[in-house]
Amino acid sequence: MRKRFIHILWALLGTGILFCILGFAAVWNGLIGYMPEIEDLQNPINRFATQVYSSDGKVLGTWNLNKENRIVIPYDKMSPHLVEALVATEDERFYEHSGIDFRALGRAIVKRGIMGQANAGGGSTITQQLAKQLYSETASSTVQRFFQKPIEWVIAVKLERYYTKQEIIALYLNYFDFLHNAVGIKTAANTYFNKEPKDLTVCEVATLIGLCKNPSLFNPVRYPDRCRERRNVVLQQMVKAGYMDRSEYAKYSAEPLTLDFHRTDHKDGTATYLREFLRQYMTAKRPVRSDYPSWNRVQFVIDSIAWDTDPLYGWCNKNFKKDGSPYNVYADGLRVFTTIDSRMQKYAEEAVYKHVAGYLQPAFDRENKPKPSAPFSDKLTPNQIRSILNRSVTQSERYRTMKAAGYSPEEIHDAFRKKVEMTVFTYHGDIDTLMSPLDSIRYYKGFLRSGFMSMDPKTGAVKAYVGGLDYTHFMYDMVSLGRRQVGSTIKPFLYSLAMENGFTPCDMAPNRQQTYIVAGRRWTPRNAYHSRYGQMVPLKWGLAQSNNWISAYLMSKLNPQQFVQLLRDYGINNPDIHASMSLCLGPCEVSVSEMVSAYTAFANHGIRTSPLFVSRIEDNEGNTIATFQPRMNEVISADNAMKMLTMLMGVVDQGTAGRLRYRYNMEGQIGAKTGTTNNNSDGWFIGFTPQLVTGCWVGGEDRDIHFDSMSMGQGATMALPIWAIFMKKVYADPTLGFSPMEKFDIPADYNPCASQTEDEFGEEGIDEVFE
């Protein structure tokens, strides 16, 4: 009987072993549960954040989907302490097993399963934990988790076959989610300590490895005391594993928990406006008219031109991977190398902030303080102000959300007028206040906006790009998306057309007010100043003084249709620009990037260079998959470009940009043009040296938000100082290689008036103008 019982036991044991073997084989071959394909095991991490680099090698930021802000780094870029802490804490026999630690597994079964010791530790190896992270869904029950375990064992064994121990460590640390959008050790090190993984201290390493047990439970931001205790447990494990001695433990465990926490967010960092512009630009689809609202026809036309002419526009949907799918900037781990110089970008952001936030905004607030209509012009009626605010309400995210949720117009109206607790932006830091959503819209309209861009006129490389003062609160990009009236900054284009038609800078024109008949209607341009009124003055004087009468006179002698075509050649593609007499004074709306690009023709022998934002793109293995070259077109002849250059240098030396010399002590050769629109709604300044063309716009969100006084609202006050502050910082940095001593390529004996001819001028009165 006893013999038979023993045989039965052996039979049961053998049957159990056989079933285990068969079950293991079934799991191995994917007959039971999910088993990843070999290709998946060989490429277990397939979602990487795209990194955006500056031209000098700095990471400006990343593009990623939620919880996929992962930047993979190799094992040799990790601190040795990081590896030691992980092995000591999570799998002390890591280097001795092949995916499954049977000794630890047996210990866990006895102590946790049989004896019920909750703190006895688990039996999962680092490789098993990696398998769980990569391929197991979150279990909804203990039973489901029980059946997941053998699948993870098989995957762990397979991972050990395909990867070295170092590679498994790297995979684990690169994949783990450390909370706060810090996915992977590189992002975690930057988020919690503002460091690279190889630079982490022992305490910092122990803090991060402590999160591997349960990142939510030991969250260092929410539970610092609990996190510090867990850190010290990791340090104890390192002592136990022989990676440090007791004296070192005593030293490190006594240290406080010190973080340099900064949540990684696409709204933070350097060049935020450029990064968002590039993300949208590269992921754009072929423009379809029906996708654009009726009021945004201009953007449809401009996007269509970009799709046809710019390889970068819609790059992700024009280029495909080996498998035929389009590139995904959120998951493919691309490396986008921009032309931005991180140092110059920093100087540009500082210059914009210093002048707008530090000088203009306080002055604007003082001017508005006694005005009931603030921040709007006191020329507006209450009904007009109400109309502007209501339009902004319907464009707000809150309005769209409430409307989509089915709220009635009356309910939405009441909600926007009910005071609620909110946090609002100030230049001194965010503040908590009680304010209605409608009042908050009006509050934010009181902040002046700005756009700034600097580029190399010969290569097109964009060196600095500032679309606004604070991306979190003012997301609208005033460099590429915003278009405002350009005022007198359009005049160099008009003068260049005159040069192309045989005029010279020394030709004389009547400096007097005249009335023109335009399509049967009388038009009498005004001028801000009356210096040399009634005299015959040279054209170069008219441009230097930004004289409207001289510009109108020139326009009367030229073909407006030809002027519109020339603007197209300069890269100004707004389809709403039509041939008219008043076009000579700049009522058309143009972006900062278009204006800066257009001015490159004056510094580049008549050849306009389009902005070059990206030099190359690499895949996640470092292979170059795209390169980009400057796009150029000849706008005016080299000789006429030199004529324009001499006149625009006169704007600085004897004209409206003279304060560059006497107030900012700017040296060297500089060409420039100021611009101011009606009611001081827009202040422009575009200046260029032989090495850089830089433009700046300052104004309100709406045209009815502006300075009342000309002295404060003109381009020479609003925008010119930003250019000066930026250039002085650039010149002061010897590592950049820019010098005020650089000269324009003009022959020493060049005479811009060599082809001067006699010209007849009409009598003062009314001219009939062709249109």
Question: Language-model segments: which ranges?
Answer:
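N-terminal type II signal-anchor transmembrane helix
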Residues: 1-53, 93, 113, 359
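Short, well-structured active-site flanking segments
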Residues: 95-105, 183-186, 245-250, 499-519, ...
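Non-catalytic structural connector segments
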Residues: 245-339, 343-407
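Active-site-adjacent helix/loop patches that line small-molecule binding or acyl-intermediate pockets
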Residues: 125-126, 134-136, 141, 145, ...
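Short, glycine/proline-biased beta-turn/loop segments that scaffold the active-site neighborhood
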Residues: 256, 481-536, 610-624
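Peptidoglycan glycan-strand catalytic modules in the bacterial/periplasmic cell-wall system
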Residues: 10, 46-49, 53-304, 313-316, ...
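A penicillin-recognizing enzyme superfamily signal
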Residues: 338, 342-358, 391-456, 461, ...
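Active-site SXXK
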Residues: 85-87, 238, 348, 459-460, ...
